[in-house]
């Protein structure tokens, strides 16, 4: 259950009011979750190939690269090895760069973390992720791993890198002085990209055109949310709470990109005041 007093509205660094709810983790006594009610009850949806402008300093919808232009950074070795195994399943008609991937591998070094450990990401081919099929490829542009998941009847989170299937959700763990951990599950904003995110001409969680889904995020991304929370019991608690919160009054604090802007049009010949009869 949500902890007593766990619901709050607070301001993020970018300014807008955002609503949160706090849960104790039933599977981990030392972990507490802060859940972004505002984003999870919004109607964001991925619009890859349907208006996505990409992640460049200038809009580039014609490239149909989505957020795949810089490769995917692996969260750990387990993540990397899972993707390597998935790549072995891909056929030539699913993967445009199959020949390159099989010849040189699908990952490459990309620097070191703060502790000096080597970091890895998916290899780049023609200035984008090796798994990204480009416009003109027979099945269409998009992720080869995602395509294979659809064809094989699996969820794409079983095959794609963690960061890819989680987007635009993001979980950040913060260890407290008493040794407990606070896990904050919210949207993946520009800051998730590091310093370069601020230079993007467009980002989907700020774009009203991406908030047109038929279901709220916690429903449309239910499988992703379940895996990120790590336990069915916690997932069920979160969904039950959000179902109740979404139908309650007043409604949850709205996402700034989803809030409609209303304009008042004056009738010709009036100064905006009511006309006397």
Predicted feature locations:
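Short loop/turn segments that flank or connect secondary-structure elements
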Residues: 1-277
């Amino acid at each position: 259950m949500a902890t007593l007093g766990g619901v709050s509205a607070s301001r993020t660094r970018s300014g807008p009011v955002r609503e949160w709810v706090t849960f104790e983790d039933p599977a981990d006594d030392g972990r507490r979750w802060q859940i972004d009610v505002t984003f999870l009850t919004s109607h964001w949806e991925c619009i890859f190939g349907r208006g996505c402008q990409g992640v460049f300093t200038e809009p580039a919808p014609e490239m149909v690269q989505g957020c795949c232009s810089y490769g995917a950074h692996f969260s750990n070795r387990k993540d990397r090895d899972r993707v390597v195994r998935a790549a072995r399943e891909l056929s030539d008609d699913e993967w445009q760069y199959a020949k390159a991937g099989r010849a040189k591998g699908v990952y490459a070094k990309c620097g070191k973390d703060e502790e000096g450990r080597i970091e890895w990401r998916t290899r780049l081919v023609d200035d984008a992720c090796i798994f990204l099929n480009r416009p003109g490829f027979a099945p269409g542009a998009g992720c080869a791993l995602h395509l294979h998941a659809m064809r094989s009847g699996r969820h794409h989170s079983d095959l794609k890198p963690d960061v890819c299937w989680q987007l635009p959700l993001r979980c950040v763990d913060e260890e407290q002085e008493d040794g407990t951990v606070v896990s904050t599950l919210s949207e993946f904003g520009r800051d998730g990209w590091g310093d370069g995110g601020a230079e993007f001409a467009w980002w989907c969680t700020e774009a009203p055109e991406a908030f047109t889904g038929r279901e709220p995020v916690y429903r449309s991304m239910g499988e992703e949310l379940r895996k990120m929370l790590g336990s069915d019991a916690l997932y069920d608690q979160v969904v039950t709470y959000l179902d109740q919160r979404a139908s309650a009054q007043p409604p949850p604090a709205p996402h700034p990109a989803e809030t409609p802007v209303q304009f008042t049009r004056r009738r010709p010949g009036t100064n905006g005041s009511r006309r006397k009869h």
